[in-house]
Amino acid sequence: MPDSVRAETGESVAKARVHELAKELGITSKDAVAKLQELGEFVRSASSTIEAPVVKKLRDAFPDAVAAPEAAAPKAPARPAPKAPAKPAEAQASVKPVETQAPATPAAAKAAATPVAPAAPAVKEQKEGSAARPGAGGPRPGNNPFATSQGMPRAGARAEGERPAAAPASGAGRPRPGGPRPGAPRPGNNPFASSQGMPRSGGRGDGERSGGPRPAAGSGGPRPAAGSGGPRPAAGSGGPRPGAGSGASRPGGGGGNRPTPGMMPNRTERPAPAGRGAGGGAGGPGRGGGARPGGGAPAGGGFGKGGRGRGGTQGAFGKGGAGRGKQRKSKRAKRQELEQMSAPSLGGVSVPRGDGNTVVRLRRGSSITDFADKIEANPAALVTVLFHLGEMATATQSLDEETFALLGEELGYKLQVVSPEDEERELLSTFDIDFDAELEAEGDEDLQARPPVVTVMGHVDHGKTRLLDAIRNSDVVAGEHGGITQHIGAYQVNHVHEGEVRKITFIDTPGHEAFTAMRARGAKVTDIAILVVAADDGVMPQTVEALNHAQAAGVPIVVAVNKIDKEGANPEKIRGQLTEYGLVPEEYGGETMFVDVSARQNQNIDALLEAVMLTADAALDLRANPNKDARGIAIEANLDKGRGSVATVLVQSGTLAVGDTIVAGTAHGRVRAMFDDDGTAVTEAGPSRPVQVLGLSSVPRAGDTFFVTGDERTARQIAEKREAADRNAALAKRRKRISLEDFDQAVADGKVDTLNLILKGDVSGAVEALEDSLLKIDVGEGVQLRVIHRGVGAITQNDVNLATVDSAIIIGFNVKPAERVAELADREGVDMRFYSVIYAAIDDIELALKGMLKPEYEEVQLGTAEIREIFRSSKFGNIAGSIVRSGLIRRNAKARVLRAGVLIGDNLTVDSLKRVKDDATEVREGFECGIGLGSFNDLQLEDIIETFEMREKPRV
């Protein structure tokens, strides 16, 4: 219907479903959805409801389809037709209720064949009696959001007034020129019905029952029963039922309104059974009587509540209804039903299972929801399954790899957690960055020689930094606390080899056991490893670990036997020990070069550098392409008060220049300045050159890769996605795990004690190493350690506030707080500890964790006494006259009573102890005494009294 006509009739464009509009416009639902998406409207499916403005846009998009049904609408007189004469008896018969239920009579059939115009006075009487609103006899098509066609007949459909044998309708039922037609009802809401108002295949239509024509769709005449003009059988109401569309505005009515005949398919007419309503099933007893304003008759069963304009429901308990048959199940419903039947049940829920070989790939830190999306399962069901397996987690909580493996094994899936390298590759592929393809595209003409990168590795205090100091002729050790390297240093030196000045890049790694990850990173970026072994100490644990890192990285090793100037030095012993690990010296017929050096005396330093250059030239192809965007790795990073984030990076390929936009781990930014290891400003850095970079948004972690991007927006997006992935992985790693067996005990005992820490340090590598070492501390199941925040730089006010909220301890590693921050921490009672050597921090935290543990007590036997006599006292109870057989008896000690080896009384206390007549603190072996055990009086001769005390057991 055009909007102009709607405006005339006072109607508004209502909501409608997409498939209903498509049917009205004569197009397919798919075309309608596609057109709406073209118009910029988001529509999920053809059953979605769209607002009135969107309805108008769709109608305007198909003007031809709208005009066609309007052209097919019947022409009707502009004014009501004169009322046709009717017999008074027939009019009374059409409205008078019947007391008893009876089949339709021939007179009723005859009355049905007469014109329906006389029904108008009856409706008028009903309106006056029930105070119904004018026009409530039928629904207004424009306002019914559930109507199939919104009052628009299909093109070519037969109009209601043109049906054969139908008399002219009354004035109340005649349509105005271009006026609306009643819309088709929505299927009923009776949940017990098998048909739900759907038409049966080959069934009879609503308006095609035998016995004569119905009243006009818009007529206000009485509702005929069984196709007759007689009253409805067994209707409990005292008045007539309203006309045919009255049920459309209320759910729960009897038969409800009928679809417009023009919207119904042509079917073979069959006679309707007697006693059945023309528009619905048999009316149930006790139906509410009278018309309700605005919505026809009240709902069945006497409940007068109406719905929001829904169509009429079916008959009572699904009988009859609108005469529609059972709807066939859709393919989707059948598939879901089949899956539910075939899916196994675990813990009361059905979850689709794999065949044991189904591989599911998940990212680090994935949640149950991510896993559920992969296998098309309900996350809540997986939470239930996990609970029955002894693990508790929420649907959005990040899980670790072990938990996923447990869940996957139970459900028949092989879960593969994507490695960080694959995860990084997938992330960069979303930005069209493929480094592997770039390397394959490079030819030999693009590659140029580059300096070797040498990593100095070895056990703690074997002289690695002293050796590097001798090479650089600078004092590096003086800057390290405790003589232990706690940073990764990168330096570049010049060496004359065969008359040519060659550059060598050195990386100094820590030797302390806490810095395993930093040593592994050093081995990963290196070309040659120098293994430093002290001639007096020999091979130590970190020596073997460094050797394993170098061998795993596949880099050649040069052994520097240091401290040969000390007494007791035995270089030959070192060679023999390293032979066991596969490092055979050249003089023994092997391939490993051994050089005896003294870093303190600067002995054989040149020989060591010469060995490095010979190894590089003989075993390695050291070339890189300098004519491209730089890529490399962050060696270390720190937060400088004046310069901000400062990262030491090693360029591996390409050339890094000032002004380039780079991404380093979760940090990004534009390079504002670069400095070499001497502090000299440089404008660009080629392959194998270490430089300090200023301008990053945050402090990258040691070992993070960096590369140059085209613009800052891309750099920021990559950094944010990396940060989100790292955060999920950290949450999964930090997740508290508690089994069902321990859950009840944990609830009974209270929360598990947790020591919260905030770690701040001067460089990121040291903070990371400290965190890893602290998380490895295991002092029992009763105490847990949690690092709630870590960062690089001075301790700030935000750190103190966070520690206040979470009752955390702040650990400062080579950093101090500002005076104002220290005052705030003192005022809030926040404990701050400061360390410059890493193992001191580890020892203190371990002792603190042990102090948080609940004390363990052990029973210590004190002595035994045998009862010789029993003295009864009304004031003190029974007193045991005893002789001490072993040990001693002490007042207030715990006691138990044994009779012939059987425990009689336990957890007693020695309340009184007398020696002769005097009170005694303790009585030793061989002496007699009187022992009072309080209210315990079950004592006999020859009973044994054992005394003991509970002493706190020291933590190991």
Swiss-Prot record:
Q: Where is the tr-type G domain?
A: 449-620
Q: Binding positions for GTP? A: 458-465, 508-512, 562-565
| Record-linked Pfam families | EF-G_D2, GTP_EFTU, IF-2, IF2_N
Q: What name does the UniProt record give this protein?
A: Translation initiation factor IF-2
Task: Give the Gly residues compositional bias ranges.
Answer: 236-257, 276-324
Assigned GO CC terms: cytosol
Annotated stretches, region: G1 = 458-465
Q: What is the lineage of its organism?
A: Bacteria, Bacillati, Actinomycetota, Actinomycetes, Micrococcales
- NCBIfam families linked to this entry: IF-2, small_GTP
* Functional summary from the UniProt entry: One of the essential components for the initiation of protein synthesis. Protects formylmethionyl-tRNA from spontaneous hydrolysis and promotes its binding to the 30S ribosomal subunits. Also involved in the hydrolysis of GTP during the formation of the 70S ribosomal complex.
Region G4, residue ranges: 562-565
Give the region (Disordered) as residue ranges: 68-357
Biased composition annotated in UniProt, kind: Low complexity:
86-123, 141-156, 164-175, 212-235
Q: Where is this region: G5?
A: 598-600
Question: Which CDD domains would you find in this protein's record?
Answer: IF2_eIF5B, IF2_mtIF2_II, mtIF2_IVc
Renumbered to this chain, region (G3) spans 508-511
